[in-house]
C-alpha cells in the first residue's frame, strides 16, 4: 500500500508582455524599496536593499539602492518592459542612485515624479539627534 505522493506543483510565472510601466522608489532613512508595476498598478517585480542581504546601516546606502533597482529592472525586462515613469517617495540617500541604475539597466525613463508626502503640520517629528 504505497501512499499516494502529492505532486509538488508550483504555479508557473506567466510572462506578461508589457511595454510601459511605473517604477515606485520608496527611499527611507533605513531602506530603499523599488517596485515596478504596469500602468494599472499591478506589480511586475520588486526588490529592496534588505531583501538583497544588506543589513543594518548598509541598507540605507546609495549602493544598496542601486543593487535593488538593478534587480527589480532585470525582473521587469524579462516581462518585456521598455519604458518607465519613475515616482520617488521619501527622503533617503538612495533616490538618485536607484534612478540611475534603472537607466543603466536599459530601461528608458520618460518621467521622474517626486511624490513625497508633505504634512500640513501633522504629527510631531522625532526629537533631534545629538551625536
From Swiss-Prot:
GO MF assignments: rRNA binding; structural constituent of ribosome
What cellular component GO annotations does this protein have? ribonucleoprotein complex; ribosome
What biological-process GO terms show up in the record?
Answer: translation
Keywords attached to this entry: Ribonucleoprotein, Ribosomal protein, RNA-binding, rRNA-binding
Q: Name one Pfam family in it.
A: Ribosomal_S11
Q: Does the keyword rRNA-binding apply?
A: yes
Q: Which domain of life is it from?
A: Bacteria
Q: Report the HAMAP family cross-referenced here.
A: Ribosomal_uS11
Subunit relationships: Part of the 30S ribosomal subunit. Interacts with proteins S7 and S18. Binds to IF-3.
Stated role: Located on the platform of the 30S subunit, it bridges several disparate RNA helices of the 16S rRNA. Forms part of the Shine-Dalgarno cleft in the 70S ribosome.
Q: Which family does it belong to?
A: Belongs to the universal ribosomal protein uS11 family.
What is this protein identified as? Small ribosomal subunit protein uS11
